[in-house]
Design a protein with these regions (language model features):
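Mitochondrial intermembrane space
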Residues: 13-150
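N-terminal signal peptide c-region/cleavage motif recognized by signal peptidases
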Residues: 6-9
């Protein structure tokens, strides 16, 4: 049964720090322009009534492209991941520094979110109960940008 748990699952009593994005790696591929056009036509066709909550995406191809032109990135250890715009340069991403850490809970899953500004958020999910140590402000360095999971 333990084999089914992800390798990056937080262990009891673990402290999580926001990752240094200098070592982050892209693990998913960016969609090509042809793929984006194809999925826009399919997603926003007459079947869009199924996706009424996403109807705003279908008003303009550029809005759709902005939302869907993303690739998955992971921290060096694979513990945190994010969907990052393919229009963002890797060099800019690697220079980003965490500004805030927050924990939210949905059902039995805790989500530790490290905010790097400009909509860039790397997240870690765990079944453990997680909480932010301190006020969650990371501006003064990583030592204050920590969450504990028990």
């Amino acid at each position: 049964m333990l084999l089914l748990l992800p390798a990056f699952a937080a262990s009891a009593g673990e402290r999580l720090s926001c990752p240094d994005l200098a070592a982050a790696v892209q693990v998913g591929n960016c969609p090509g322009e042809a793929e984006l056009r194809y999925t826009f036509d399919g997603f926003c066709s007459d079947n869009r009534r199924i996706y009424q909550h996403d109807a705003a995406l279908c008003a303009d191809y550029e809005e759709y492209r902005k939302a869907k032109n993303v690739a998955q990135w992971e921290s060096a250890d694979g513990a945190f991941s994010a969907y990052v715009s393919c229009d963002a340069t890797p060099a800019r991403l690697h220079l980003a520094r965490a500004v805030r850490i927050a924990v939210s809970r949905q059902g039995q899953i805790s989500r530790v979110a490290c905010d790097y500004g400009e909509g860039l958020v790397f997240a870690h999910r765990s079944r453990l109960q997680c909480r932010v140590e301190g006020d969650g402000d990371c501006q003064d360095g990583r030592r204050r940008c920590v969450a504990s999971c028990d």
